[in-house]
């Protein structure tokens, strides 16, 4: 007797079904750009509204924006140091806010109401291209910080405390962007898939705890990425001991 394949409701879930934009020989994931632009627009609108008619004693959105500013400033100062953190505050703040808004926007915004010819909108950070691009930017910032501060002496850290460490230090430079990108991508994609499967199976109450846990995890992932980015930049700026 032939065995028939079992049809499961979550078998219809697709991973990697994309809307492609072609520019010459280059293919871009169109839905990632669209969702990124929407989320950036929401963030800009939030900032513009919160900074309109600013008061000496902040209330409402202004109070929240000042809290975020203090939080990001303290994060950058703790990891980079008092002397250099101001130069890197915009970069660290942009990373944190974009990742945070992308993660939460992917979970809270009903993207399915926006129909596309192919694929569907979602969190930009659930696409490996987005997380790899940000991780490479962090690596470039690390090298720029070190070379601009120390010049060629920056490369001394690869042979300290002993030249035997050279191959391990080189491997470490490759593992930094890999760990940054895959940690963020894996957590956000796994959360989206888990919620998607539960919505198919039990569409009412059961997915809510998973969604709340996903929001908490998403915030933590934004914090981890920004903290590690600031730490790497601080590592490039300071003298090795």
From Swiss-Prot:
InterPro entries: ATP_syn_F0_a_bact/chloroplast, ATP_synth_F0_asu, ATP_synth_F0_asu_AS, F0_ATP_A_sf
Membrane-crossing segments per the record: 30-50, 89-109, 128-148, 193-213, 214-234
Pfam families per the UniProt record, alphabetical: ATP-synt_A (PF00119)
UniProt GO MF annotations: proton-transporting ATP synthase activity, rotational mechanism
Gene3D superfamilies in the cross-refs: ATP synthase, F0 complex, subunit A
Entry keyword set: ATP synthesis, CF(0), Hydrogen ion transport, Ion transport, Membrane, Thylakoid, Transmembrane, Transmembrane helix, Transport
Membrane topology recorded in Swiss-Prot or TrEMBL: Multi-pass membrane protein
PROSITE patterns associated with the record: ATPASE_A (PS00449)
UniProt similarity note: Belongs to the ATPase A chain family.
NCBIfam families with a match to the protein in the record: ATP_synt_6_or_A
Record function comment: Key component of the proton channel; it plays a direct role in the translocation of protons across the membrane.
PANTHER family: ATP SYNTHASE SUBUNIT A, CHLOROPLASTIC (PTHR42823:SF3)
UniProt-recorded name of the protein: ATP synthase subunit a
Source species taxonomy: Bacteria, Bacillati, Cyanobacteriota, Cyanophyceae, Synechococcales
Gene behind this protein: atpB
